[in-house]
């Protein structure tokens, strides 16, 4: 199944979303594996009930394997727990997008609805109602996953599991440490994901702050909130909280959205600032102190301020505490607690594998974990030689103005191919629905109450390789519905689309996505790439 770890490989490293993915550019001759006679309790023992673990377990069972899946949620620093489904369903993608949607509604009501003829009196948001709606939907998904495992003939145990040796797992049912039981498995998959990190060197942070593990089930409205971090999680949380009407400040060490295209990152931040999110650049908390029902935050610039809520979103670490990996001498990156696994999901222990966020150098995205888990199961139990391809993986960030990306950033393309070999086509423009309400002021134009000086809300950007007939290696879009716009473009990039293919394609009018069919200005030309007139992303004549 797994090659000798000392064998030298020549992999092309493609960092699809600047999250350090691999590209398996060669077809490896894999050792075929068939389920042996039942010398183990199970053919496949999966630790972790997130997207990757569940997908791999069900795929293995579909090919005749006897599968056992463990899932147990250790409480957050504030005691928050949740059901099966992992981060994405419970404290990640799903609740995040629902709250983003709620915030987007609020922005439309407050900023745009009056101009479109709607009248609202005493518009007010109910945080508790939002949390109830979100959590009710999550519980329905938890239930569907349980029934899905059962119908797939995957045995499920709500137990805290750890490794005893390369084929033995011990566990504590429902986390009860008074009784330990063991099972054996021919293969073991670790798919425990990651958990948010709170720094040890900030006094009071672990005791008084929350993370994304807590915000989506917070019983009391967050009030005035400090978000610490520059990650996409930090910007998404601060964005929807601001849109819901809360006073939000973001404390940033240096740049936002490190690893993503920085022109797009700056545009996202600028839009958030225009909507009222405040940023403390280069300023971080040094100490948190409880003051009645508030939190006093002392900053690195010697200032201090009171907040109702402090949310840390500075990064995530692999959830491997208690797995007993050290006794097996498993290779782990100690700086982020991630398991070192190759492009085949193999660890340095032949019978143990790792997929999803807990694996080193893998994009932290649920669809990536699902695909990798399914492919691994097919290799183990179906004699497949399929290999996970980590190139051109799309992603979307659900900030107030969304950002979708696939492939290389402008900076990464310059680094890998040289600036002279890269051409960047781009255009800034205003979304049609927004520009109808928030028109930029002109001296001779008739004025009305909706005039507002706003920067161009949208950006369309293609990063191309000159020596390959301008093959597109990077797609970037800042604007509404970024995920929907980006998904189809990812397929085009995987099929090696070229700039001329975009030029020859007819756009759907009027949409923001059609802007990619009308990109003619390059960064190297030095010309303005701001659209002059038009209808959103398209031309009107």
Swiss-Prot record:
Q: How is the cofactor bound?
A: Binds 1 FAD per subunit.
Q: What is its EC number?
A: 1.8.1.9
Q: Where is this region: Loop important for the interaction with TRX1?
A: 438-452
Which SUPFAM superfamilies does this one have? FAD/NAD(P)-binding domain, FAD/NAD-linked reductases, dimerisation (C-terminal) domain
Kindly list the biological process annotations in GO that this record carries. Answer: cell redox homeostasis; cellular response to oxidative stress; glutathione metabolic process
GO terms assigned for molecular function: flavin adenine dinucleotide binding; glutathione-disulfide reductase (NADPH) activity; thioredoxin-disulfide reductase (NADPH) activity
Where in or outside the cell it occurs: the entry states: Cytoplasm
One Gene Ontology cellular component annotation held by this UniProt entry: mitochondrion
**Which residues hold FAD?**
51-52, 71-74, 87-88, 92-96, 161, 357, 364-366, 509
Q: What is this protein called?
A: Thioredoxin reductase
Q: In which organism is this protein found?
A: Plasmodium falciparum (isolate FCH-5)
Q: Gene of origin?
A: TRXR
């Amino acid at each position: 199944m797994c090659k000798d770890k000392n064998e030298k490989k020549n992999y092309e490293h493609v960092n699809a979303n600047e999250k350090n993915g691999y590209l398996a550019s060669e077809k490896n001759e894999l050792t075929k594996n068939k389920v042996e006679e039942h010398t183990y309790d199970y053919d496949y023992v999966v630790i972790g009930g997130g997207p990757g673990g569940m997908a791999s377990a069900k795929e293995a069972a579909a090919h005749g394997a006897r599968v056992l899946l463990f899932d147990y949620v250790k409480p957050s620093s504030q005691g928050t727990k949740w059901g099966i489904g992992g981060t994405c369903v419970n404290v990640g993608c799903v609740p995040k997008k629902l709250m983003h949607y709620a915030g987007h509604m609020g922005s439309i009501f407050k900023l745009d609805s009056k101009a479109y003829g709607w009248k609202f009196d005493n518009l007010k948001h109910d945080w508790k109602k939002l949390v109830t709606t979100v959590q009710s939907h999550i519980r329905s998904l938890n239930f569907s996953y349980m029934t899905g495992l059962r119908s797939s003939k995957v045995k499920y145990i709500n137990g805290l599991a750890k490794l005893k040796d390369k084929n033995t797992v011990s566990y504590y049912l429902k986390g009860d440490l008074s009784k330990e039981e063991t099972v054996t498995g021919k293969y073991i998959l670790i798919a425990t994901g990651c958990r948010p990190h709170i720094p040890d060197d900030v006094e009071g942070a672990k005791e008084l702050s929350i993370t994304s593990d807590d915000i989506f089930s917070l019983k009391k409205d967050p009030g005035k909130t400090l978000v610490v971090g520059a990650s996409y999680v930090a910007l998404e949380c601060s964005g929807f909280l601001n849109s819901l009407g809360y006073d939000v400040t973001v404390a940033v060490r240096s740049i936002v959205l490190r690893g993503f295209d920085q022109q797009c990152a700056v545009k996202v931040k600028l839009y958030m600032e225009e909507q009222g999110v405040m940023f403390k650049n280069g300023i971080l908390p040094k100490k948190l102190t409880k003051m009645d029902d508030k939190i006093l935050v002392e900053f690195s610039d010697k200032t201090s301020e009171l907040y109702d809520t402090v949310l840390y979103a500075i990064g995530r670490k692999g959830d491997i505490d208690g797995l007993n990996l050290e006794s097996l001498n498993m290779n782990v990156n100690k700086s982020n607690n991630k398991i070192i696994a190759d492009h085949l999901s193999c660890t340095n222990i032949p019978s143990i594998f790792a997929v999803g966020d807990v694996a080193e150098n893998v994009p932290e995205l649920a669809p990536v974990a699902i695909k990798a888990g399914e492919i691994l199961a097919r290799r183990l139990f179906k004699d497949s030689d399929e290999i996970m391809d980590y190139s051109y993986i799309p992603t979307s960030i659900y900030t107030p103005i969304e950002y979708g990306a696939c492939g290389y950033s402008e900076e990464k393309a310059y680094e890998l191919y040289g600036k002279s070999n890269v051409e960047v086509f781009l255009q800034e423009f205003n979304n049609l629905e927004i520009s109808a309400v928030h028109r930029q002021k002109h001296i001779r134009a008739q004025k009305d109450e909706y005039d507002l000086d706003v920067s161009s809300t949208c950006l369309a950007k293609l990063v191309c390789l000159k020596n390959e007939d301008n093959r597109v290696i990077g797609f970037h879009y800042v604007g509404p519905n970024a995920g929907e716009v980006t998904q189809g473009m990812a397929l085009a990039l995987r099929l090696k689309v070229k700039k001329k293919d975009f030029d020859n394609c007819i756009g759907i009018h009027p949409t923001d996505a059609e802007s990619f069919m009308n990109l003619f200005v390059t960064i190297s030309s030095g010309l303005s790439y701001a659209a002059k007139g038009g209808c959103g992303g398209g031309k009107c004549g």
